[in-house]
Amino acid sequence: MDESKKNERLQQLTDIQYNVTQKAGTERPFQNEFYDNVAKGIYVDIVSGKPLFSSNDQYDAGCGWPSFTKPIDEAEVIEHRDLTHGMIRTEVKSADADSHLGHVFPDGPQDKGGLRYCINSAALRFIPVDKLEEEGYQAYKKIFE
């Protein structure tokens, strides 16, 4: 992502969006926008706009954050070892904007690969199916057909 475009987008973020995506913060569980979203659509990086996750792969993990079994395109997420807070975890960042998204854990549904991408709502923007074309994401409509 072009640095000037990224800086412009960063200035438009709310405090929580900035803290989560740029400082690897974490929003509160069960008190965020998408933890219980059941609408069909895709989730894009709040900074770059790149598609990251589909509601088809979202499930209720009971953790209080949106959880997914996989990204739309694995090339759009990068994983890093995270040793903060006295834990060993795998951080998930967006490939294009280097936004902190959340973490991935090996305790997801076994029949869907066994992974749980636990993602902060503040790192995402949701595009409902009926707005995909209008928002420039028409190529992703096929996911829901």
Swiss-Prot record:
<dbReference type="InterPro" id="IPR011057">
    <property type="entry name" value="Mss4-like_sf"/>
</dbReference>
<protein>
    <recommendedName>
        <fullName>Peptide methionine sulfoxide reductase MsrB</fullName>
        <ecNumber>1.8.4.12</ecNumber>
    </recommendedName>
</protein>
<dbReference type="GO" id="GO:0030091">
    <property type="term" value="P:protein repair"/>
</dbReference>
<dbReference type="GO" id="GO:0006979">
    <property type="term" value="P:response to oxidative stress"/>
</dbReference>
<dbReference type="Pfam" id="PF01641">
    <property type="entry name" value="SelR"/>
</dbReference>
<feature type="domain" description="MsrB">
    <location>
        <begin position="6"/>
        <end position="129"/>
    </location>
</feature>
<dbReference type="GO" id="GO:0033743">
    <property type="term" value="F:peptide-methionine (R)-S-oxide reductase activity"/>
</dbReference>
<keyword id="KW-0560">Oxidoreductase</keyword>
<comment type="similarity">
    <text>Belongs to the MsrB Met sulfoxide reductase family.</text>
</comment>
<dbReference type="InterPro" id="IPR002579">
    <property type="entry name" value="Met_Sox_Rdtase_MsrB_dom"/>
</dbReference>
<dbReference type="InterPro" id="IPR028427">
    <property type="entry name" value="Met_Sox_Rdtase_MsrB"/>
</dbReference>
<dbReference type="GO" id="GO:0005737">
    <property type="term" value="C:cytoplasm"/>
</dbReference>
<feature type="active site" description="Nucleophile">
    <location>
        <position position="118"/>
    </location>
</feature>
